[in-house]
C-alpha cells in the first residue's frame, strides 16, 4: 500500500522548508492568491534539494480573499490565467535544475473545477497545452479528475485530513458547520481510514468510498509541522509506503 503526502506551500503562512522534510509533493503558490517571485524561488530550490515532487498551485487572481472567493469568469480567461502561472513556476523550476511534475488548483478554482465542467475543461486544457506529461491533483470522485483523464492526463485523487465531507464526496463549504476537523487525533484516524479503508465518514454519518492517492496536509496552522510528522510516522508505522505518485519525482536533478 502506498500514498503521497502533499502540502500547499509558498503562501507565506507556514514553515515551508521544514515541511518539505515530511511531504512528498509540494504545491507551490504561483503569486495570484499568495506568495510571489522570491517565495516561488525559495520553495522550488528547497524542493529540488530535498527531492520533493514540484507542483504548481494556480488560483484565481484574488490576493484579497486568498483565492477563496468564487468567480464567474469566461473559460478563455481561466485558461490564460492558469497557463500564465504554470509558465512562471516552470521558469523557477528550470533555473533550479528541476521541473514541474503536477498541478493542483487552489481554493475557489479547485472547488469550482470539481463541480463545474466548463471550468474543469478550461483548467485541464491549459495544463494539457502547457505539458501533457503533467499530472493533475484533484478532489477524489470529482468531475475535475474525470475531465483530466478524458484529456489523457494522469489524475491523482486527493483527500483531506482536516476537511469535512458530504455524502456525495464533496467538501463541506468553509462557511458551513462541519467544514473543518480541528481535533488532531480525529484527523489522524480519518487519514488512516481514508488510506487503508479507502473511505471517509460524511458529516451526515454515511461512509463515502474514495480513491485516496494523495493526502493534503495544510501547513498554515500553529501545530502543522508537528501534526505532519505524526501523520507521516503513523502511515509508515502501518506499513504504508509514502512517496510521490508514480514516477513523479520532479524535485530530483537531471
UniProtKB/Swiss-Prot annotation:
Key words of the record: ATP-binding, Hydrolase, Nucleotide-binding
Pfam families: LamB_YcsF
Catalytic activity line of the entry: 5-oxo-L-proline + ATP + 2 H2O = L-glutamate + ADP + phosphate + H(+)
Annotated SUPFAM superfamilies: Glycoside hydrolase/deacetylase
Binding partners and assembly: Forms a complex composed of PxpA, PxpB and PxpC.
NCBIfam families listed in its UniProt record: PRK05406.1-1, PRK05406.1-3, PRK05406.1-4, PRK05406.1-5
Role noted for this protein: Catalyzes the cleavage of 5-oxoproline to form L-glutamate coupled to the hydrolysis of ATP to ADP and inorganic phosphate.
Protein name (Swiss-Prot/TrEMBL): 5-oxoprolinase subunit A 1
Gene source species: Burkholderia pseudomallei (strain K96243)
Upper taxonomic lineage: Bacteria, Pseudomonadati, Pseudomonadota, Betaproteobacteria, Burkholderiales
Amino acid at each position: 500500500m502506498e500514498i503521497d503526502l502533499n502540502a500547499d506551500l509558498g503562501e507565506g503562512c507556514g514553515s515551508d522548508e521544514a515541511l518539505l522534510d515530511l511531504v512528498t509533493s509540494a504545491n507551490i503558490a504561483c503569486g495570484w492568491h499568495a506568495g510571489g517571485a522570491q517565495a516561488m524561488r525559495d520553495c522550488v530550490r528547497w524542493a529540488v534539494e530535498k527531492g520533493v515532487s514540484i507542483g504548481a498551485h494556480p488560483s484565481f487572481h484574488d490576493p484579497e480573499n486568498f483565492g477563496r472567493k468564487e468567480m464567474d469568469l469566461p473559460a478563455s480567461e481561466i485558461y490564460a490565467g492558469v497557463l500564465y502561472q504554470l509558465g512562471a513556476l516552470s521558469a523557477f523550476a528550470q533555473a533550479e535544475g528541476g521541473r514541474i511534475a503536477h498541478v493542483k488548483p487552489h481554493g475557489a478554482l479547485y472547488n469550482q473545477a470539481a463541480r463545474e465542467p466548463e471550468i474543469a475543461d478550461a483548467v485541464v486544457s491549459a495544463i494539457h497545452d502547457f505539458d501533457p506529461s503533467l499530472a493533475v491533483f484533484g478532489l477524489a470522485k470529482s468531475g475535475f479528475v474525470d475531465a483530466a483523464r478524458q484529456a489523457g492526463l494522469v489524475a491523482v485523487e486527493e483527500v483531506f485530513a482536516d476537511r469535512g465531507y458530504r455524502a456525495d464526496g464533496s467538501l463541506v463549504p468553509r462557511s458551513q458547520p462541519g467544514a473543518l476537523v480541528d481535533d488532531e487525533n480525529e484527523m489522524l484516524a480519518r487519514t488512516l481510514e481514508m488510506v487503508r479503508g479507502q473511505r471517509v465518514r460524511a458529516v451526515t454519518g454515511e461512509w463515502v468510498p474514495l480513491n485516496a492517492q494523495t493526502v493534503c496536509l495544510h501547513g498554515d496552522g500553529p501545530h502543522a509541522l508537528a501534526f505532519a510528522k505524526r501523520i507521516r510516522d503513523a502511515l509508515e508505522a502501518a506499513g504504508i509506503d509514502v512517496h510521490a505518485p508514480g514516477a513523479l519525482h520532479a524535485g530530483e536533478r537531471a
